[in-house]
From Swiss-Prot:
Domain of life from the UniProt record: Viruses
Subunit structure: Homomultimer. Interacts with nucleoprotein and with the cytoplasmic domain of glycoprotein.
Chief subcellular location: virion
GO cellular component term of the entry, any: membrane
Keyword Oxidoreductase: no
Stated role: Plays a major role in assembly and budding of virion. Completely covers the ribonucleoprotein coil and keep it in condensed bullet-shaped form. Inhibits viral transcription and stimulates replication.
Pfam families, per the entry: Rhabdo_matrix
A GO term for molecular function: structural constituent of virion
Similarity-based family: Belongs to the novirhabdovirus matrix protein family.
Protein's UniProt name: Matrix protein
Length: 189
């Protein structure tokens, strides 16, 4: 009896944004504000993602919050066009580069089992980075919407593409190395 080999079939798994039904709920994060980075200007996507992760983690208290990835997407996207100024730091007597970015209307979508409805008024958030700091001053709106509404499906697809990019993997590794031991390790595998 001859042994017949069947060709292997490739099983294609469609992206998540195509398998969601129109009535599935997503968490929509919107923000308006000003992002100020002192001490450095991010030059590539990996640096932008790393700085955005650091700031989003400081705002949300860690990276396990469902709004973490949308905020990273909003902040890294806002770091495209900014105004840089050199100012003298009186403590160290060195010139520091201060770059300001405007977040006109940042919006991103994330899948969440329990989307929340919350408005956070204008506040200022600051976190330290090597040779400087990142400050975001702005307001947030967290809302639950259906996937089929407005442009949520395309926003979800763009976010998924960014999360699967090699730049995001490099930024995640650098971000994981910068965290103190014992914090937020359960969410990263």
């Amino acid at each position: 009896m001859p042994f017949i080999r069947r060709p292997k079939r490739a099983i294609l798994i469609p992206p998540l944004h195509l398998t969601l039904k129109d009535d599935d709920k997503v968490l929509v994060v919107e923000t308006v504000g000003t992002l100020i980075i002192s001490g450095m200007t991010p030059s590539n996507l990996t640096e932008k993602l790393g700085l955005a992760m650091k700031l989003a983690s400081a705002i949300l208290g860690g990276d396990s919050h469902p709004a973490f990835n949308p905020l990273v997407e909003i902040f890294s996207g806002a770091m495209e066009f900014g105004a840089s100024v050199e100012k003298l730091d009186f403590m160290t007597r060195e010139n520091k580069v201060i770059t300001t970015y405007k977040v006109a209307r940042g919006k991103a979508v994330a899948l969440s089992n329990f989307p929340m409805e919350k408005r956070v008024g204008e506040k200022s958030y600051t976190t330290q980075i090597r040779n400087g700091s990142i400050t975001y001053t702005g307001s947030f709106l967290f809302s639950a919407e259906h996937v089929g509404l407005k442009d949520n499906r395309s926003l979800f697809a763009a976010g998924e593409g960014l999360r699967e990019s090699p730049d995001m993997a490099q930024a995640r590794e650098a971000f994981a190395g910068s965290l103190p031991k014992g914090k937020n390790e359960s969410s990263r595998k």
